[in-house]
């Protein structure tokens, strides 16, 4: 009987020690972190307070000369933020004009990206003559941001041309005198 009691006591002691050993912490542990990264596609023109510009022409002072366009405007900057999805390798920014002005070509050029941005910034298409159809002005945008505000992103240069100049489509004979004509330029960032 003594042997049985001793065997039972030793068994219970071994079980208790075993349970204690299993309940102790080890020298490593782990946990999970769930991360959410949103898809982002944002574009704007800066500085936003003064993004509406005025361009025009000066009448010739000598007979036989054409209209002279005002100096090009270089005050605006194209900013964007992009986090692409796995399914979409890159994004583009397109530009279009809502109203064609007879006899006038409106040119826009986006300079290479500069400023405080990072990531896979897009590449400029160079000089475009604006039309009612979407045209790609920036291509190859990956996950990137240009930085916000003036002096960040792509500097935009707007210039006017009367009639058909290099790369132009307007016809000089279509020009009509007008005090002011307003056209809206729209930029859109989208997946390829």
State each model region's role.
Residues 1-7:
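Bacterial Sec-dependent N-terminal signal peptides
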Residues 5, 17-24:
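Sec/Tat signal peptide C-region and signal peptidase I cleavage site
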Residues 9-16:
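Bacterial N-terminal signal peptides
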Residues 24-130, 135, 139-192:
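N-terminal small/polar-rich segments of proteins
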């Amino acid at each position: 009987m003594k042997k049985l009691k001793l065997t039972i006591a030793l068994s219970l002691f071994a079980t208790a020690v075993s349970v204690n050993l299993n309940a102790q912490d080890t020298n490593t542990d782990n946990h999970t972190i769930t991360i959410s990264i949103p898809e982002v596609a944002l574009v704007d023109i800066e500085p936003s307070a003064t993004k509406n510009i005025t361009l025009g022409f000066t009448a010739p002072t000598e007979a036989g000369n054409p209209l002279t366009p005002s100096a090009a405007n270089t005050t605006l900057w194209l900013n964007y933020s992009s986090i692409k999805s796995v399914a979409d390798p890159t994004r583009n920014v397109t530009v279009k004009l809502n109203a064609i002005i007879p006899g006038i070509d409106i040119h826009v050029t986006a300079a290479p990206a500069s400023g405080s941005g990072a990531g896979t910034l897009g590449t400029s298409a160079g000089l475009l003559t604006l039309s009612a159809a979407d045209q790609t002005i920036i291509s190859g945008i990956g996950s990137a941001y240009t930085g916000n505000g003036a002096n960040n992103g792509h500097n935009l240069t707007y210039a006017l041309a009367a009639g058909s100049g290099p790369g132009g489509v307007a016809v000089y004979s279509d020009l009509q005198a007008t005090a002011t004509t307003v056209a809206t330029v729209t930029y859109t960032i989208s997946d390829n």
